Swiss-Prot record:
Residues 228-329 form the HD domain. Catalyzes the addition and repair of the essential 3'-terminal CCA sequence in tRNAs without using a nucleic acid template. Adds these three nucleotides in the order of C, C, and A to the tRNA nucleotide-73, using CTP and ATP as substrates and producing inorganic pyrophosphate. tRNA 3'-terminal CCA addition is required both for tRNA processing and repair. Also involved in tRNA surveillance by mediating tandem CCA addition to generate a CCACCA at the 3' terminus of unstable tRNAs. While stable tRNAs receive only 3'-terminal CCA, unstable tRNAs are marked with CCACCA and rapidly degraded. Monomer. Can also form homodimers and oligomers. One of its GO terms (molecular function) is tRNA binding. The gene is cca. This is Multifunctional CCA protein.
Amino acid sequence: MKIYLVGGAVRDKLLKLPVKDHDYMVVGATPEQMLSLGYNQVGKDFPVFLHPKTGQEYALARTERKTAAGYGGFSVDAAPTVTLEQDLLRRDLTINAIAQDDAGNLYDPYNGIADLEKRILRHVSDAFVEDPLRVLRVARFAARFHGLKFTIAPETLSLMTTLSRSGELEALTAERVYLELDKALSTDNPQVFFQVLKECGALAVLFPEIEALFGVPQPENWHPEIDTGIHTMMVLEQAAKLSDDNSVRFAALVHDLGKALSPKEHLPKHHGHGQKGLPLIKSLCERFRVPNEYRDLALLVCDQHQNIHKITELRADTLVKLFDKADFWRKPQRLEQLLIACEADSKGRKGLEQTAYPQADYLKQCFAAASAVEVKSIIAQGYKGAEIRTQLNVKRIAEVQAVKGLQPIEAK
């Protein structure tokens, strides 16, 4: 029995990046031997064991043979005779096919170290096309390592294109697609994930709502970048710079889906695109089982981003209605999330990336003023039942009016 550190831990150590997870490969062992040493078996499809003390994963060396469509369509051979080289051959990229023994010796049969130095994402073998999930994984690695100047090898991108056209992507489960999406949103450059998917044809298959935005024009005076798809990528890039909250990044990604539905005769204008996008967001979230908190924020941003941009033009009572509708009273963090997404939208335009967004501070002031109204003071004045709610609303509007520098509206 011989144990090797494999995969991301070796790769990230060589890149001098923080190592989060340690995965190990065991050559020359049987499940019975692992169990006798106190390891706990957790793998259903192939033998994976947890170390009795550290809880780290130890997988028996294995080979895989394609037997059916999709991510799980493989038969596995994890016999003790499977070699280190055979196991590494089944992996997706050369940079993920490097092993290290307990003495620190590196094993690199497929030249992953050279590709790390060249900053290239390259497939290990043509068996790459047997697993459609690898299209998403490579796109995610391209996003994750974009700051290190990694690029995808042309021959690998060609295989990704072949996979995207094969119909195999449709066999991926919603959970697997969403997991890769969420991991991609967590990177410093999530827009690269979608740009790569578009380049290889996978965006149209998995995220047609986003693909549909490319080629849709916007008014050049507001959007020097013109193309809605390019704008969306720029907004996502800005959102990643402004916040590490994935729900904000997701909202930025889908905020303009409705523009793809604008009648051609009305282009480049997009009247009511916020409201038109709501059903598209609901459908996408249902399809990939996106968490409710992501969905709800995305719907709010889609519905209200145009109002937020022109917030100083809105009446005080309209603002209080917005606070009610968005339930900011109970979820004040949602206001911050909304404003960050809207700021990203404003900055996600060619040449306007450094522009200030004063709307955020203004709306925060309005909300702080409205929030300062206390229910107990209204009750102390003798109001009861429905009157309390009415007076609370009146006083909140008055406080917002004061922020706007206007005279309070007469109570009715």
